[in-house]
């Protein structure tokens, strides 16, 4: 009996302790005031709100209006927020600038604090206000609004008629003081007052005409307060906290203390012992069960039950179970399908292997057909040891030219097409796709590769390598971006604006490169097709000699070779044309024609030239003989200061184009004379430094070709090219 009495006393003591610690409200507590619900820990009478903190004690007046202190309550959130209405501050003036009204807001929030969801706002012209707060520490800030008319932009509080700044959380004392810079005399008609107030973010939309005049007659604004239980954390209160069943505790984000919330699957008031009640997901349609399943509510959750003949998957969906006989046929079908797929995959792999082998054999066939064996033989055989030819792959060339797209075409000619290519390292090159038809042209292509690979000169286009795996071979050059000398002198793509200094320098550079080929290369090289269309110019107008498809290496023990005549009409050496004997003087003659083109600006062979032979060499001689030398010189070139230089250049051109090769100078001598001519000044008179006109006439007069030499075409794969078209065979 004594044990039972002891247990009864303990139970009574526990219930009294629980009521004291958790402070649960009485059953008769008011739960609504007007249209605002009053929920624990808030209350309106003793025993109905959280004990020990008068901040939770709200007042419901006779008009059914709920107040927190002197602030009307809008609503409350059990997650830790209370919305109230806070009076605005203002200062007003008459038209003379005399103060007529002043209200400064001063508010104490008890144990509650300002939320960071509020904004400090100032409305008025030439106005400013201060916000002073205190809590754990003091904080002050201010805002300035400037304007001179009521036509400021609506909806914006950026400082013109309206200013708005954030407010930090955690402060329990607020003081707002409005001011004016000049007491509003100039704006009194539309803005007699300065207004300052706190307002919840997004709850004030500025309208200049209404707000600057009387702030739309609004005296209070919604403000968000943070609240929490006590001054300890969840860990410190442990089970002694106010949180009820099926709830959890979390530390307040607005300052000290803690708040409560219902667990997932429960809803209600977490501050009451049984405030968090289970949510019936099956009734509230908060479940995700499929149409074939049945929802079953459980405490804090739910289950999706599948009917007979169905099974539940991971997404709470019910799928029909597979019958044994159906499963057996499914196995057979899947086995057959997988087996067939394996066989087809094997056949596909075999086809790919065969296709790869055929492609490899085809590339090897093209390699041999395009002279790969010949190239390897010549590189590895007797001859110069400095040959360095890079072999590019078919795949690399296709990617570099974007599949040989027509937008990449730089030009087309008798020997093929030239594309602009971009290599993987982003370097730009010119890719020449040869147009070959027989064995001799393959040999000429390989010859061009070998010749260019041995040349290292700044005025000779540099070959980077070749690709022989394609149906027609490809040659990869450095990219020269400013066209040919022919384009600049006669073409329509560029203005014919080369000055005499440009032309003399170009002539000197070409002469120097030919002298190098004839005298300084490991084995002498005769270009055999020197013409303006085979001289490229870069962006600095530096000359680059190109197109070595017709070039020949001269053995060290020979001075000339007997070959099939090859070249271009107008530039072709008459002696070589008549005898078939090729030597370095053939290049000298062709260079002389190029020099005449630079002097005259006229084409080497032109059938539309009036009163002058069609061949430029004959035309030059005829003009000199008839005292019309000045007429043949390009008008853009000659002036009073360079007549002697042009006369000297004409003399060099005349010597280079003599009929007999033995009477022509060597390219080394021509290059030296042109280089010396470049550095000469014009301070000496014409008569003191240069030969008489008669001597020029003699030099040019003996060069007139016969009618046969003038109109006959050269023999070879490049002999019938039209010199009036854009020729870029050199790999631009």
From Swiss-Prot:
Residues modified as Phosphothreonine: 393, 563, 568
Positions of post-translational Phosphotyrosine modification: 477, 576
Keyword annotations of the record: ATP-binding, Calcium, Disulfide bond, EGF-like domain, Glycoprotein, Kinase, Membrane, Nucleotide-binding, Phosphoprotein, Repeat, Serine/threonine-protein kinase, Signal, Transferase, Transmembrane, Transmembrane helix
Domain Protein kinase: 404-677
Gene Ontology terms for molecular function: ATP binding; calcium ion binding; polysaccharide binding; protein serine kinase activity; protein serine/threonine kinase activity
Localisation per UniProt entry: Membrane
Segments on the Extracellular face: 24-329
Residue numbers binding ATP: 410-418, 432
TM regions (residue ranges): 330-350
Disulfide bonds: 234-249, 243-260, 262-276, 282-295, 289-304, 306-318
Enzyme class: transferase
Catalytic activity: L-seryl-[protein] + ATP = O-phospho-L-seryl-[protein] + ADP + H(+); L-threonyl-[protein] + ATP = O-phospho-L-threonyl-[protein] + ADP + H(+)
Magnesium recorded as keyword: no
Domain EGF-like as annotated: residue spans: 230-277, 278-319
Cytoplasmic-side positions: 351-732
Gene Ontology biological process terms, A to Z: cell surface receptor signaling pathway; intracellular water homeostasis; oligosaccharide metabolic process; response to salicylic acid; unidimensional cell growth
Residues the record marks as carrying a glycan: 57, 75, 111, 154, 217, 246, 288
SUPFAM superfamilies, alphabetized: EGF/Laminin (SSF57196), Protein kinase-like (PK-like) (SSF56112)
Function: Serine/threonine-protein kinase that may function as a signaling receptor of extracellular matrix component. Binding to pectin may have significance in the control of cell expansion, morphogenesis and development.
Entry's family note: Belongs to the protein kinase superfamily. Ser/Thr protein kinase family.
Name of the molecule in the record: Wall-associated receptor kinase 2
Organism: Arabidopsis thaliana
High-level lineage: Eukaryota, Viridiplantae, Streptophyta, Embryophyta, Tracheophyta
Gene expressing this chain: WAK2
């Amino acid at each position: 009996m004594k044990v039972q009495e002891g247990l009864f006393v303990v139970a009574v003591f526990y219930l009294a302790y629980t009521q004291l610690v958790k402070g649960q409200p009485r059953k008769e507590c008011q739960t609504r005031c007007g249209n605002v619900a009053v929920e624990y820990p808030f209350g309106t009478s003793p025993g109905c709100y959280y004990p020990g903190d008068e901040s939770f004690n709200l007042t419901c007046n006779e008009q059914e209006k709920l107040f927190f202190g002197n602030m009307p309550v809008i609503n409350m959130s059990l997650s830790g927020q209370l919305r109230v209405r806070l009076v605005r501050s203002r200062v007003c003036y008459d038209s003379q600038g005399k103060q007529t009204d002043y209200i400064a807001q001063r508010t104490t929030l008890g144990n509650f604090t300002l939320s960071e969801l509020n904004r400090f706002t100032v409305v008025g012209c030439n106005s400013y206000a201060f916000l002073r707060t205190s809590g754990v520490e003091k904080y002050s800030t201010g805002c300035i609004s400037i304007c001179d008319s009521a036509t400021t932009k609506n909806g914006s509080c950026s400082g013109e008629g309206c200013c708005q700044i954030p407010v930090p959380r955690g402060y329990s004392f607020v003081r707002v003081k409005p001011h004016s810079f000049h007491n509003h005399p100039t704006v009194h008609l539309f803005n007699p007052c300065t207004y300052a107030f706190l307002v919840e973010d997004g709850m004030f939309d500025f309208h200049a005409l209404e707000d600057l005049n009387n702030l739309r007659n609004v005296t209070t604004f919604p403000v968000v307060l943070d609240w929490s239980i006590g001054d300890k954390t969840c860990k410190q209160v442990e089970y002694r906290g106010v949180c009820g069943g099926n709830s959890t505790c979390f530390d307040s984000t607005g300052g000290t203390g803690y708040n409560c919330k219902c667990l997932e699957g429960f809803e209600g008031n977490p501050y009451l012992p049984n405030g968090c009640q289970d949510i019936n997901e099956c009734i509230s349609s908060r479940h995700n069960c499929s149409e074939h399943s049945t929802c079953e509510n459980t405490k804090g959750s739910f289950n999706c039950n599948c009917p007979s003949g169905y099974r539940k998957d991971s997404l709470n969906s019910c799928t029909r179970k597979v019958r044994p006989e159906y499963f057996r046929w499914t196995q057979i079908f899947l086995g057959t399908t997988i087996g067939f797929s394996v066989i087809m995959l094997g056949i596909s792999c075999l086809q790919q292997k065969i296709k790869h082998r055929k492609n490899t054999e085809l590339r090897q066939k093209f390699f041999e057909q395009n002279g790969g064996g010949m190239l390897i033989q010549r590189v590895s055989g007797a001859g110069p040891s400095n040959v360095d030819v890079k072999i590019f792959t078919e795949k690399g060339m296709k990617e570099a030219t974007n599949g040989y797209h027509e937008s990449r075409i730089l030009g087309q000619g008798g020997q093929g097409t030239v594309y602009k290519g971009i290599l993987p390292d982003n370097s730009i090159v010119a890719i020449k796709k040869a147009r070959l038809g027989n064995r001799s042209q393959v040999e000429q292509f390989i010859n061009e590769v070998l010749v260019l690979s041995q040349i290292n000169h700044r005025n000779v286009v540099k070959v980077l390598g070749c690709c022989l795996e394609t149906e027609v071979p490809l040659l990869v050059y450095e990219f020269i971006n400013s066209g040919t000398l022919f384009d600049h002198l006669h073409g329509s793509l560029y203005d014919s604006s080369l000055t005499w200094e440009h032309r003399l320098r170009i002539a000197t550079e070409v002469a120097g490169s030919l002298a190098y080929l004839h005298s300084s290369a490991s084995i002498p090289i005769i270009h055999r097709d020197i013409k303006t269309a085979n001289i490229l110019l870069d962006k600095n107008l530096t000359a680059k000699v190109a197109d070595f498809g017709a070039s020949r290496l001269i053995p060290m023990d020979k001075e000339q070779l007997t070959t099939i005549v090859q070249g271009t009409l107008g530039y072709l050496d008459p002696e070589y044309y008549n005898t078939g004997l090729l030597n370095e003087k053939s290049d000298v003659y062709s260079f002389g024609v190029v020099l005449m083109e630079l002097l005259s600006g006229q084409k080497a062979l032109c059938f539309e030239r009036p009163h002058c032979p069609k061949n430029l060499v004959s035309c030059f001689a005829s003009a000199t003989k008839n005292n019309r030398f000045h007429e043949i010189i390009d008008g853009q070139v000659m002036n009073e200061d360079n007549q002697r230089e042009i006369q000297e250049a004409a003399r060099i051109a005349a010597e280079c184009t003599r009929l007999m090769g033995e009477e022509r100078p060597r390219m080394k001598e021509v290059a030296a004379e042109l280089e010396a001519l470049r550095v000469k000044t014009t301070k000496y008179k014409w008569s003191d430094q240069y030969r008489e006109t008669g001597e020029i006439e003699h030099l040019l007069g003996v060069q007139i070709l016969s009618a046969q030499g003038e109109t006959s075409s050269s023999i070879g794969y490049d002999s019938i090219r039209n010199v009036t078209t854009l020729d870029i065979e050199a790999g631009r």
